[in-house]
Amino acid sequence: MMDAGIADRVFPGGALLVRVQGKTRHASYHGRTALDPAGVPVSRNTCFDLASLTKILATTPLVLLAVQHGNLDLDRRACELLPSFVGDGRDAIALRMLLDHSSGLPAWRRYFEHVPPAELSTAAGLETVRKMVTAEVPEAPPGSRALYSDLGFVLLQWILERVYGRPSDTLFMDWLARPLGLERLFFVDLKSPAASARARTGRVFAATEDCPWRGRLLRDEVHDENTYAMGGVGGQAGLFGTAEDVAAMGQAWLDSLLTDHGLFRRDLVQQFWQKSRLPGSTRTLGFDTPSSGASQAGNGFGPRTVGHLGFTGTSLWIDPDRELIAVLLTNRVHPTRDNESIKQFRPVLHTAVAARWPK
C-alpha cells in the first residue's frame, strides 16, 4: 500500500513501522525525501518533521514526569505558574484542561505574521508569541467542551520551563531521549546556530513544504510557522525523528502501562490514557483516540487505543490490548500542504495493519 501511496502522489516519501508485543513485525521505507534532484531514497535513517506528534512524544511525557516527580499538579491553575495568564476566564484553566483540549482556547492563530522579521527564530520571537497566547480569551467556558488547541501546548512548554528553569528541549534530551537511547528523536533549535548545526550534522531529512511565507523549500527546519517564529522548539511542534525512534517512544509508553518497570508510573499512564468524559470528546490527557465512524485510525484497533496525528503526514497509534504500535511517517506536505489525499489513504492503511495483526 505504501508504494501505491507514492504512485498516487499521496506523499513523495514515507516509512511504515509496526511493533507487536515488543518486536518489530514490519518496517518498510518508500519513495524519496524530496522531488528535486537533492532527494534521496527514504531509509531507516530518514528524519521526518513530526509536527503534532511532538505533543505525545515530548510535551505530554515531560508533563507526566513532572507530576511523577511531584513538581506539577494537573489540577493546578495555569495562572498560578503564568501570572500574566489571568482574566476573562483564563483563571479557571487547569493544567489538565490544556492537556485534554478542554481549556476553551482557540485552535490556532497566525502569530508568526505579527512577529517582527528580525525577531523570527530568536528568544525575542519566542517571547512575542507567548505574550500573544496569554492574551487569548477562551472561546468556550473552560472545562465545558473539547476544542483542539495548539495554544494549550505552547503554554505547557512554558510552564515546564518555568518550573525547572531549563529549556524544554534540554529537558526532553535529559529525561526522555538519552534514558531511552533515542539518538534520532530531537529538536532543531534555530535560536542557536551551534545547536541547530549539531542537530543537522550527519542526518538526512525529508523535505516538507516549498513555503511561500519563508520563500524556500523546508528540509531541516520546522514546518509549523508559529514554532519557527518561536525558534524551532515548541510544545505543539518542532520534534524530528525516524520511524524506529518514534516507535521506541511509543513502546516506552506501552511498557509503562503493562509493567512496573517502565519509565513512567503505571497509574499515571492509566490516568493519562483515560478518555475524557466531556460529550463528543475523543481526547485523553495529551493523546487522541479513534473517533467513531470515519476515523483516521481506520477500523480494527481496540477500544483502548490512543495516538495522534501530525499535520505533515505523520501518525502514531498504540493499541494496548494487542500490544501493537503503528507508526506512519510521510512528508505529504511536500511540495505543498494543499495535497490532502492522505485523509483517504491513512484510514485504509491502518485498517489493513489492524487486520494483519489481529488480537
Model-predicted regions and their roles:
Residues 1-50, 71-73, 135, 224:
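Short, conserved catalytic-motif segment at the N-terminal edge
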Residues 2-3, 16, 22, 49-75, ...:
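Active-site SXXK
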Residues 30-34, 88-303:
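Short, surface-exposed loop or secondary-structure junction motifs
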Residues 48-51, 146-148:
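Catalytic tyrosine of NAD(P)H-dependent dehydrogenase/reductases that use a Tyr as the general acid/base
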Residues 73-88, 179-180:
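Short, glycine/proline-biased beta-turn/loop segments that scaffold the active-site neighborhood
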Residues 334-358:
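Generic C-terminus detector
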